[in-house]
Structure formats: structure tokens, C-alpha cells
Amino acid sequence: VERDIPSICSQLVLRSGERIRIYCLHPTPPSPTESDTSAPRDAELLLVGKQIRERDETALVFGDLNDVAWSHSTRLFKKVSELLDARIGRGMFNTFHAHYRFLRWPLDHIFQSPEFQIKQMAKLSDIGSDHFPIYAKFQYCPAEEHKHEVETADTGEMSQADEKIAEGREEAN
């Protein structure tokens, strides 16, 4: 959405020939020094979510999304993309702010397609950043019996995502 904010979209080709799309995102946070609203951030996330859904991609999404897992925007992204939050059932992983012990939020996220099983996940020690790093080990299990159930956006939620994308694009320009 914002031209000066880097995002990475890459493709991993497995030995079997199967392709996995990898997205690394770091949208602008809503703050007085960055952006007046969350519209550009929400639009960036929802654009990626729609792309994953429309292309029916097997995907991993990583990043400092500058949002918490329980926000409306993040929950809408999960439904639109039909991805799973790697954190569910494993803990909060409060990764920001690494320098303030009593004021930390889970702003760094990992979302995966249901074909992935999380074998290991951990918040690592301070590396000098204002965020703690997260380590995750995945196992690709495309067999149907390994898939987890995902939440799916209904028509109203898809319309809401389209509205948020339009609003974010308008604000970014």
C-alpha cells in the first residue's frame, strides 16, 4: 500500500515441486510519529490475505504487524486469508518492547496454511532490537488428515476487508 514500506513476497519450491509462498511484512504502525490511523497497516495485511485466498496458496506470513492477535484487523486477516495463527495454544509471545519488562505486547506474528504443523516455537533472548526474535520450526504435511480447521470470512467480512483496503490505499496516497 505504501511505496516506501518494504514487504517481501518470495516463493519456496520444495523437492517435490510444490510451491510455498512466503510473505514478510512490516506495515506502518498507527502512532503520532508514523500514521494517524491504522488504515494503511490494515490495508497491507488484508491485501496479502485476499491474495493468498484468491490464489489458493500454501503460505507462511511473518512479520512485525504492529497489531495484537486479538484486534479486529488481525482476526479479519485470519478469516480472509484462511491461515492459522501459530501462537494459538502455544502462548502469547510478547515480543515488543524488549527493553521494558512490564510493558510488552505480542506484535510479531507467524501465520501458516493448515498444511503446516508447528513442531517448535519459542521467543528467543534479547538481540539488541526493540523486539525479541521468534523461532519456529514447521513440518509440511499436505495430507488431508493433518490439516487444521480454519476460520473463513463470510460475505460481510469480505466486503469489510475490501472497504478497509480502499480506505488504506486512499490514505497512503
Protein language model regions, located:
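Soluble catalytic domains of enzymes that build or remodel membrane lipids, polysaccharides, and related
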Residues: V1-A172
